């Protein structure tokens, strides 16, 4: 008998293990449909209802006459096993993907079905729905392949001569003679061509055939897998000569790959040091051995420039995956990867779960970025998943950053499986730009109330007047524009979240950036009726307005210098990100104004000035990483200046000029920052000296959430005390910093454990055994990146 181990697609901790189902022999060979295999979606029955499941194990079992055993060693009568009722899809993943899904569930205390779903393309899995008659039925996937009709030369193309008055036939034949062409393109050019193609087809002059269309190619999302006659990637370029530091970094990666046991190499290189070229050459060596590579880039840095570097080297062998692509585009790229034609996958963190077989190298660029941690279940950290994958596959993991996370630096120091390759200088030999700290408190004391200091204004005038470019960063994290009544102190807040509403100049409206709640800005204070509602803070729209006024008054600059604003509003439309960068590149002198999305991943030779308008706002967040993130942001954005032959300079405006994070970043002195930061982390018990878990609870009834939080805290404290004693800390249940979000109240419990301890196992056991309160949601975040 053949038995399948199936993860049932119902997201609950109660389904904490795969279930065993008998597989009819005809399903194994695919009689009448697809064969059953690991990774397939299947139809099963669980508890009287139909459900979709994923096969994660398949084994032939010979039971004794009275009793058999399932894959997990549980004695079970073979006659009691339910059968797999239908195979609903081809395999989405292989045995390694199945093993990873099971590991993710244990590591991150997540429902098995949510972990398995990571490996499926968006909206490509059949669903089970219940009809009005009460019967369950399978609803086909919403996403699948799409075809285009193409016209090619027929067997009689050369011999056929159309009549002189058959103008449309002549036009169509001329177009086809230049190469295969889509019917849709012929229709756009010549109008309705259906009857013309039918007539030409009857004569054997042309052939009309269906070909799969790879969505997204026409707008540059990825041209990989383009059909004949479609747009092709540029021819691969040759690798440049490496610097000594780059050669040493590539050698370190090669040594890690040769070890074949999942070693980690941290490429610790300043901005402009050529880290990307190191990745490219390490990938070339990996591909030469017949293996594949995955490159992770933060979503915010996944710019057309970044993709072009990889496609310029590897051409049509590059697949791209990111959230700005449509579901159809991602489905096509997923399928392209599964076909084996894609040798390199470039994408955000979810690219880890694409069906790329035989991966020998994973690169995580900007490894310090918080976006590599998923903020919904399963709350995985991409670095840890990639390290697990490479240990299993006998490959190597490469982490790259100009400002590595403190945890990565600690691992290099303490873990013999981790090594570092330093690139302390820029690849072109140019110096790092000088950073000047502008004390805005002193500016204010001298009577200045302007958003731009005198020194930054003068620097803008000097650089722009010479036809050069500037980048201005508005650090909006923890700093947004709001209204405040100067009479009573009232600040309009979101009725659904415990945050102030952000004021938007365009449309004079107040918006909650957590839940999207929007309301017109009141003309007077809703609390006391005062007309003195003052705008505090500065959004990018207001900064753009004041910057325009400043530039218009600068000698030699004036209104002809464009300001290109990049933020969440201006980059919403598809392709807007690329269009804005192209506009900036094409201008003679221009200012790129934006939020953190401009701090990294941009490489323009003629940017000579970088200004940070408000460097210290992140320091005031109740987050133990606040200083680290401020240090990283300043060094990252500073690296946008002076990347080519022209010298660069950086102006950092701050009200906290004496803060060690800002002073250290301004002098590129990581050691200064670490000497101040690490003792605080050790004293207070924060990473890298401990591991943490954040147990989250949320619900619509605040009293119910608080009560459940106290109960769960007591259960946790007892479990930890009994299993590990006093070495772990279970902090009291308290409201989150963001105590209310989208009409739900939020509490959390922080658990701290020594390094090396299995933090997940006790929490997984508790969560799978506890009685669920239907009024309160609960989840575990293992190794959280923040506690907000």
Language model segments and positions:
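Short amphipathic alpha-helix segments
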Residues: 670, 706-731
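C-terminal effector/interaction modules appended to NTPase cores
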Residues: 742-744
């Amino acid at each position: 008998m053949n038995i399948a181990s199936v993860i049932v697609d119902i997201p609950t901790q109660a389904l904490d293990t795969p279930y065993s189902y008998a597989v009819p022999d005809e399903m194994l060979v695919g009689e009448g449909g697809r064969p059953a295999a690991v990774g397939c979606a299947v139809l099963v029955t669980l508890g009287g209802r139909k459900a979709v499941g994923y096969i994660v194990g398949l084994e032939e079992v010979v039971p004794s006459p009275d009793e058999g055993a399932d894959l997990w060693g549980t004695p079970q009568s073979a006659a009691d096993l339910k059968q797999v009722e239908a195979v609903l899809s081809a395999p989405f993943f292989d045995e390694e993907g199945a093993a990873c899904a099971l590991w993710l569930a244990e590591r991150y205390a997540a429902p098995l079905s949510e972990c398995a779903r990571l490996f499926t393309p968006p909206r490509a899995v059949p669903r089970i729905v219940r009809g009005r008659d009460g019967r369950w039925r399978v609803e086909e996937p919403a996403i699948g392949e799409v075809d285009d009709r193409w016209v090619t030369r027929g067997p009689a193309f050369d011999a056929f001569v159309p009549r002189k008055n058959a103008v449309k036939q002549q036009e169509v034949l001329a177009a086809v003679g230049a190469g295969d062409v889509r019917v849709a393109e012929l229709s756009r050019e010549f109008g309705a061509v259906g009857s013309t193609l039918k007539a030409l087809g009857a004569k054997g002059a042309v052939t009309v055939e269906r070909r799969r269309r790879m969505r997204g190619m026409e707008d540059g999302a990825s041209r990989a897998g383009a059909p004949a006659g479609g747009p092709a990637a540029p021819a691969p370029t040759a690798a440049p000569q490496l610097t000594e530091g780059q050669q040493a970094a590539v050698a370190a990666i090669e040594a890690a790959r040769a070890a074949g046991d999942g070693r980690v190499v941290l490429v610790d290189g300043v901005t402009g040091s050529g880290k990307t070229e190191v990745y490219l050459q390490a990938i070339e060596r990996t591909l030469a051995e017949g293996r594949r590579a995955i490159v992770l880039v933060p979503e915010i840095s996944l710019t057309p420039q970044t993709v072009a570097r990889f496609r310029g080297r590897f051409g049509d062998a590059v697949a791209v995956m990111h959230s700005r692509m449509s579901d159809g585009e991602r489905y096509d790229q997923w399928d392209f990867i599964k076909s084996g034609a894609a040798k390199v996958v470039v994408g955000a963190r979810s690219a880890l779960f694409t069906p790329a077989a035989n991966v020998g190298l994973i690169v995580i660029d900007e490894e310090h970025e918080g976006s590599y941690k998923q903020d919904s279940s399963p709350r995985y950290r991409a670095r840890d998943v990639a390290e697990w994958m490479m240990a299993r596959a006998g490959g190597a993991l490469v982490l790259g950053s100009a400002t590595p996370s403190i945890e990565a630096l600690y691992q290099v120091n303490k873990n013999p499986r981790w090594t570092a390759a330093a690139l302390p200088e820029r690849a072109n030999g140019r110096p790092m730009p000088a950073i000047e700290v502008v004390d805005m408190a002193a500016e204010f004391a001298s009577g200045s109330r302007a958003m731009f200091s005198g020194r930054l204004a003068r620097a803008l005038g000097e650089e722009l007047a010479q036809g050069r470019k500037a980048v201005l960063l508005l650090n909006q994290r923890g700093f947004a524009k709001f209204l405040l009544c100067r009479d009573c102190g009232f600040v309009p807040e979101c009725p659904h979240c415990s945050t102030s509403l952000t004021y938007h100049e365009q449309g004079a409206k107040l918006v909650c950036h957590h839940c999207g709640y929007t309301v017109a800005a009141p003309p007077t204070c809703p609390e006391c009726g005062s007309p003195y509602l003052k705008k505090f803070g500065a959004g990018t729209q207001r900064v753009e307005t004041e910057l325009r006024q400043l530039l218009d008054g600068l000698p030699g600059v004036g209104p002809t210098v464009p300001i290109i604003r990049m933020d969440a509003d201006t980059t919403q439309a598809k392709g807007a990100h690329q269009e804005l960068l192209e506009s900036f590149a094409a201008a003679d002198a221009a200012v790129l104004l934006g939020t953190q999305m401009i701090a990294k991943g941009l490489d323009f030779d003629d940017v000579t000035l970088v200004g940070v308008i408000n460097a210290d706002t992140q320091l005031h967040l109740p987050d133990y990483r606040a200083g680290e993130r401020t240090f990283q942001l300043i060094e990252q954005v500073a690296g946008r200046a002076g990347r080519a032959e022209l010298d660069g300079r950086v102006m950092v405006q701050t009200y906290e000029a004496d803060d060690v994070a800002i002073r250290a970043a301004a002098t590129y002195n990581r050691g200064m920052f670490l000497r101040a930061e690490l003792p605080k982390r050790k004293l207070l018990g924060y990473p890298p000296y401990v591991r943490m878990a954040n147990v989250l609870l949320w619900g619509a009834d605040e009293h119910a959430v608080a009560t459940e939080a106290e109960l769960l805290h007591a259960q946790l404290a007892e479990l930890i005390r009994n299993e590990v004693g006093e070495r772990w800390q279970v902090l009291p249940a308290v409201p989150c910093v963001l105590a209310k979000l989208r009409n739900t109240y939020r509490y959390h419990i922080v658990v701290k454990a020594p390094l090396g301890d299995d933090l997940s196992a006790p929490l997984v056991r508790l969560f799978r055994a506890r009685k669920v309160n239907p009024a309160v949601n609960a989840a575990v975040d293992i190794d959280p990146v923040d506690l907000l």
